[in-house]
């Protein structure tokens, strides 16, 4: 039964996450298939020459949060073992401003990245618009890669008919919880079918505001998605609507929790730069909405003994509004691309093909993370990962129903993202009221959409 649930979950997740593409852009690369083939042949000749002289080729890969992502080094080690003439150099650009830093690197002079990680849709849109990513279609065709294994993801990230990235990680949001806090309070664990009202009441029942003994019933990271995207789970609204009145009840819930000490103060979190993993690791957070990308970090840090206050954890499905199907949640993919400036495009493609394929998927799954493709072996690896919670609710939480993108495809997604982030920050810090912040979103995003 567990295996069937996981299989269904992964298949559905990857279909929905496939929507995480990018819209058309007049600024896309003018590189033709012929140019790409010629460049690939030249790169292949260079690689062959290096092999004959015994020299190693270095592939430079941009990533973020190396220390918190255990599958990075495992992927690199496996690829280097299959390619002893290659060294993969990871460059950590940090998670906070990753896409901004990457765009600066790729549009500046002297960038020597061969493979770049794509973190989100707005960042992808920006890079495609700037013409700094290589079209992958000729590589895919010549390699015989079956794009159907991505369950529609590849088709959804095409720009003007061309594909500039290939996904290798697929993530969705769940509710993490610390069982020890519930046990100490004598409160039953959260379930896979909670309305927001039930969730809010549960968080309040676990909260302790005594100075020095604080227990937070809930925790929200400083990303706008941790609050705003509660409002899109009904399938009727998107974050591109241009009118955001539907967000008011969710902001009211979180602001009231913040005022009552149910969750930590946003401004304090922002100033201190406390990472969500650090907050949960302290052992005084009962529930935290976060993505499945946290699985691998949590499992690894507990295994190494770095996390000692949150070892008894579980997950359940996202809370939902009345009338919304349980298991409705948010989805996001992480992809790989080749910069047009790379001198090793053919080898970079081999690396991408490895990470995005079956072998890479099994390595990712072995750490508890969810890859972009699913097979029986991948499902077995996820379900049997040491440290992954084995209670029925945690397994069932992986069986999602409806998935919605954090940021849907749009040519101006980056501008919209900026406007929404600014308004979110103003609301959460108290710089403006909820009504004023929503009015700001309505005005600014509507103007962007009308351009």
Describe every region a protein language model picked out:
Residues 113-114, 119, 143-181, 214-217, ...:
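A structural signal for short loop-to-beta-strand junctions that line the ligand-binding cleft
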Residues 54-66, 86-91, 114-115, 164, ...:
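Short, well-ordered beta-strand elements
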Residues 203-204, 239-270, 318:
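Glycine-centered hinge/linker elements that transmit conformational signals in sensory
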Residues 316, 366-422, 426:
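Long, aromatic- and glycine/proline-rich binding clefts that accommodate carbohydrate-like moieties
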Residues 81, 87, 185, 260-262, ...:
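Extracytoplasmic/periplasmic substrate-recognition and gating elements
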Residues 19-32, 41:
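Bacterial lipoprotein signal-peptidase II cleavage site
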Residues 50-51, 119-172, 310-317, 386, ...:
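Hinge/lid segment of periplasmic solute-binding proteins
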Residues 78-149, 184-186, 279, 284-287, ...:
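Extracytoplasmic "Venus flytrap"/periplasmic binding protein-like
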């Amino acid at each position: 039964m567990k295996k069937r649930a996981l299989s269904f979950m992964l298949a559905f997740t990857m279909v929905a996450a496939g929507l995480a593409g990018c819209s058309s852009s007049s600024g896309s690369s003018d590189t033709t298939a012929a140019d790409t083939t010629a460049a690939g042949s030249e790169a292949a000749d260079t690689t062959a020459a290096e092999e004959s002289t015994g020299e190693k080729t270095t592939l430079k890969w941009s990533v973020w949060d190396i220390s918190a992502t255990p599958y990075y080094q495992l992927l690199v080690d496996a690829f280097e073992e299959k390619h002893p003439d290659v060294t993969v150099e990871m460059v950590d650009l940090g998670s906070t401003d990753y896409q901004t830093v990457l765009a600066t690197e790729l549009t500046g002079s002297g960038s020597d990245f061969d493979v770049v990680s794509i973190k989100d849709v707005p960042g992808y849109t920006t890079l495609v618009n700037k013409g700094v990513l290589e079209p992958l279609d000729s590589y895919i065709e010549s390699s015989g890669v079956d794009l159907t294994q991505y369950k529609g993801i590849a088709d959804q990230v095409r720009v003007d008919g061309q594909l500039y990235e290939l996904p290798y990680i697929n993530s969705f949001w769940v509710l993490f919880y610390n069982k020890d806090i519930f046990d100490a309070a004598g409160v039953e664990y959260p379930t896979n079918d909670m309305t927001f009202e039930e969730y809010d009441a549960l968080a309040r029942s676990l909260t302790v505001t005594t100075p020095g003994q604080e227990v937070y019933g809930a925790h929200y990271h400083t990303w706008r998605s941790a609050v705003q995207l509660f409002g899109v789970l009904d399938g009727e609204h998107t974050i591109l609507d241009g009118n955001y009145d539907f967000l008011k009840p969710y902001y009211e819930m979180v602001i009231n929790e913040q005022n009552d000490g149910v969750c930590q103060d946003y401004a304090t979190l922002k100033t201190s730069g406390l990472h969500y993993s650090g907050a949960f690791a302290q052992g005084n957070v009962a529930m935290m909405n976060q993505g499945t990308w946290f699985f691998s970090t949590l499992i690894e840090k507990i295994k190494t003994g770095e996390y000692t206050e949150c070892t008894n954890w579980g997950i359940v499905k996202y809370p939902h509004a009345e009338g919304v199907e349980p298991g409705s949640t948010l989805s996001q993919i992480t992809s790989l691309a080749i910069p047009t400036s790379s001198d090793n495009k053919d080898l970079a493609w081999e690396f991408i093909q490895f990470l995005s394929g079956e072998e890479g998927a099994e390595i990712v799954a072995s750490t508890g993370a969810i890859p972009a493709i699913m097979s029986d072996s991948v499902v077995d690896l996820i379900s049997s990962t040491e440290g992954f919670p084995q209670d029925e609710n945690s397994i069932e939480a992986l069986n999602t129903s409806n998935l919605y993108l954090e940021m849907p495809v749009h040519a101006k997604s980056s501008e919209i993202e900026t406007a929404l982030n600014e308004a979110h920050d103003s609301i959460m810090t108290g710089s403006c009221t909820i009504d004023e912040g929503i009015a700001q979103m309505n005005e600014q995003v509507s103007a962007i959409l009308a351009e």
